[in-house]
Regions:
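WD40 beta-propeller blade core
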Residues: 50, 103, 116, 148-150, ...
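Loop/turn segments within WD40 beta-propeller blades
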Residues: 28-37, 80-90, 128-135, 174-181, ...
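Conserved strand-to-loop turn within each blade of WD40 beta-propeller repeats
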Residues: 43-46, 96-99, 140-144, 152, ...
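Structured C-terminal portions of repeat-based eukaryotic scaffold domains
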Residues: 157-299
Length: 299
């Protein structure tokens, strides 16, 4: 169902925060305040990784804090923060780019300092993500159909694992913020996989959702729920409670006003449980919707 909101207020806030910039391919809020202000990172179509803060004032104002170039003639494709579990005022960021590279950056004293960069994939490195529970480990997925894991304490030229379980490009990865070792991945092959990070030879569970799985998001409070942005097949809420037994099921499918589902996330507020924001590409649409879990959905 569509939620009931105050559209005039939402429009006003968004309008004050508008900023002209190149195409943004990924954007994520910082789990912690930066200099006492909410902040987010993004990567864009001119190969920049940038950090922005929201000014603490009566009006929402977005200010660019800093930026770093990911390389010549590349697109920035994804980013992730290291401080979702272990809070830090000096977190690391991992980014990926269209030349197949993955980068690590350290945020200290208002500077985003490059730590390392390596060629992770033969083609576009669509996605990179930290292991939320062990941020020495970084995952990456590429258009070469490979899902890889990297230990930052070792030589980053050699992955600790390289999986060909997905049959097409790997474009989404997220480490579960609620249960250690759980990892979900999505691919153009239309499959959502859940893994145990300690044993990456085979996934725990495999579910075909009928569209390229461009983004995956674990629920911030319920480890059983995964949200997918499924490109030409809308958005799905998946029950993964029994994924360790090889079972997953779609419990909600949203496909209203969707041209190409590219973005999706849960609301983190306890006041709006199961409130979801999604966005589609060609029609420039932002959707806000909720679903209601009933007992047989998650039995």
């Amino acid at each position: 169902m569509l939620g009931q909101f105050q559209p005039h207020l939402a429009k006003s806030i968004l309008g004050k925060g508008d900023s002209e910039m190149p195409g943004v391919l990924d954007i994520k809020w910082s789990p912690d305040m930066l200099n006492g202000s909410p902040a987010f990172g993004l990567v864009n179509s001119v190969g920049m990784a940038e950090l922005y803060v929201l000014n603490n004032s009566a009006e929402v104002k977005v200010t660019k804090l800093l930026g770093v170039n990911l390389g010549e003639n590349v697109l920035g494709l994804s980013l992730d923060w290291s401080n979702r579990i272990n809070k830090s005022t000096t977190p690391q960021l991992t980014t990926s780019s269209s030349d197949g590279c993955v980068q690590i950056h350290q945020l200290t004293q208002g500077e985003l300092t490059p730590v390392c960069s390596w060629k992770a994939h033969d083609y576009e490195a669509w996605i990179t993500a930290f292991d939320n529970w062990n941020t020495n480990v970084v995952y990456s997925g590429g258009d070469d159909c490979r899902l890889k894991g990297w230990d930052l304490r070792q030589n980053s030229t050699s992955p600790v694992f390289s999986s060909k379980r997905h049959e097409m490009g790997v474009c989404s990865i997220q480490s579960c913020p609620i249960r250690e070792y759980l990892l979900c991945t999505g691919s153009y092959d239309e499959h959502l996989l859940v893994w145990d990070g300690r044993q990456m030879k085979q996934p725990l569970a495999d579910l075909r959702v009928g569209g390229g799985v461009w983004r995956v998001k674990w629920h911030p409070r319920h480890a059983r729920l995964i949200l997918t942005a499924t490109m030409y097949n809308g958005y799905h809420v998946v029950d993964a409670q029994h994924s360790t037994d090889g079972k997953m099921a779609v419990i909600h499918h949203y496909d209203e006003d969707v041209s190409l589902g590219y973005g999706a996330d849960w609301c983190y507020s306890d006041s709006y449980d199961n409130l979801i924001a999604t966005c589609s590409f060609y029609n420039h649409a932002l959707q806000l919707w909720q679903f209601t879990m009933i007992s047989h959905d998650v039995g």
